[in-house]
């Protein structure tokens, strides 16, 4: 749709680029895996290139945002007789090519596959948990970041954040499935695997799992309200959903390790 402001792309690239860089550093210090680290460095480099290109072409804005700004300014002028200055864009500057943002996740996919293969036996289970977990945590994190962007771009339609919330809800059962896949969290809950805390971590995981989908559902319901404050309320709920989603994923990984 090309309607989210170009600054949101900067937010995404900086946030996930730093995460990737941190992952590479930790991997090199703790348990180096050559393919994983090499492609992790590639992710950081590709993210940096996309960020630089986006900054160089910032005056172009994005097509959908330009159209919306012009429409709103025209409407205000017609209703009030006041010719309000719209945000100015330079049409002579080429837009940022969105395809450039695909390189980092493609390189990241290779790094994740390498990480999954190295994680242990069975390989298929490790790969599934690694890839599904990355998609799930990425979706909920992206949704929370986008919720904050509505403060910067208040005229933005709700379709983008609703789409991300929907993706989080869609991915939740798959995340649950791969964490239950034997040997999984059912073994922790039954006591076959000792979590070291008398079963408390297992029930904490259950609480995090249930709370995550409830918070995502509450976020979706909140976004049906017409008031603009509903977006801010949804962002607050997504804050909590991130905490419980990471609890759902990381507690299971730590316990099953």
Language-model segments: residues:
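Membrane-helix boundary/interface segments in integral membrane proteins
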Residues: 186-197
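Polytopic transmembrane helical bundles with strong interfacial aromatic enrichment
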Residues: 1-154, 160-180, 198-257
């Amino acid at each position: 749709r090309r309607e989210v402001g170009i600054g949101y792309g900067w937010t995404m690239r900086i946030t996930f680029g730093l995460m990737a860089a941190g992952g590479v550093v930790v991997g090199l210090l703790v348990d180096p895996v050559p393919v994983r680290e090499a492609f992790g460095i590639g992710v950081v480099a590709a993210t940096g290139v996309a960020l630089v290109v986006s900054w160089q072409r910032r005056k172009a804005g994005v097509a959908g945002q330009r159209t919306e700004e012009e429409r709103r300014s025209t409407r205000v002028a017609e209703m009030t007789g006041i010719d309000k200055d719209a945000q100015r864009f330079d049409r002579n500057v080429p837009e940022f090519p969105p395809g450039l943002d695909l390189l980092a996740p493609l390189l990241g996919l290779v790094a994740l596959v390498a990480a999954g293969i190295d994680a242990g036996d069975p390989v298929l289970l490790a790969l599934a948990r690694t890839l599904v977990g990355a998609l799930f945590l990425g979706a909920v994190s992206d949704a929370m970041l986008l919720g904050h962007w509505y403060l910067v771009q208040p005229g933005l339609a709700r379709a983008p954040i609703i789409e991300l919330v929907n993706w989080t809800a869609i991915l939740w059962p798959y995340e649950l499935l791969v964490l239950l896949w034997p040997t999984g969290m059912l073994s922790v809950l039954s006591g076959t695997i000792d979590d070291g805390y008398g079963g408390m971590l297992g029930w904490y995981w259950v609480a995090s799992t249930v709370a995550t989908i409830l918070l995502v559902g509450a976020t979706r319901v909140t976004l049906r309200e017409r008031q603009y404050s509903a977006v801010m309320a949804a962002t607050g709920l997504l804050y909590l959903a991130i905490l419980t989603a990471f609890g759902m994923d990381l507690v299971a990984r730590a316990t099953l390790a």
